[in-house]
Amino acid sequence: MRAGTVAVCCLLCAASGLPAARSSQGDREPHYRNCVRLCERNNCSGAALRAFGKMQPLHMLATGWRCADDCKYNCMWATVGLYIKEGHKVPQFHGKWPFYRFLFFQEPASAAASILNGLANYVMLNRYRAAVPFQSPMYRTCISFAMVTLNAWVWSTVFHTRDTLLTEKMDYFCASSVVLYSIYLCCVRMCLAHSIC
């Protein structure tokens, strides 16, 4: 019990020295906040919202872009323009650097990288299946690892296509599952190598 109390005290002392969490520089900018508030008030209710819905491309609707999201996106670039005009560094918004949408991809380069990584993983999975006999001791463990990894790349692609609270959590949870499964895979491999499993 005493060791647990000491650990809690150490954790509290360490946490007390941490600075308070703040929003990104761009989020705190009065110009950005006013722009978003005015845009949402003028465009995201009543007849203006209906007009937005009629003009919104199908691919943007399918990926969940709402009027308020569009306001944030446009105001982000208006604020970035002011920063550049004044000779300041471009700030982050909502914990991310400004991004250019392409079609329905919120972060096209990151989404493309995730797709390519997933594709490489899929190709290697098929090569592994073709080269390694099913009876091999690590076969199912390695196939499972490939499936966990493929799932992580799918969620990474989804997250970089459209950043929402759900897609962000799924991206991070699935990436963490790859790390955890890697540790498991190493332990199983070590056990088999030393014949202790």
Where are these regions (language model features)?
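Multi-pass alpha-helical transmembrane bundles in non-GPCR membrane proteins
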Residues: 3-197
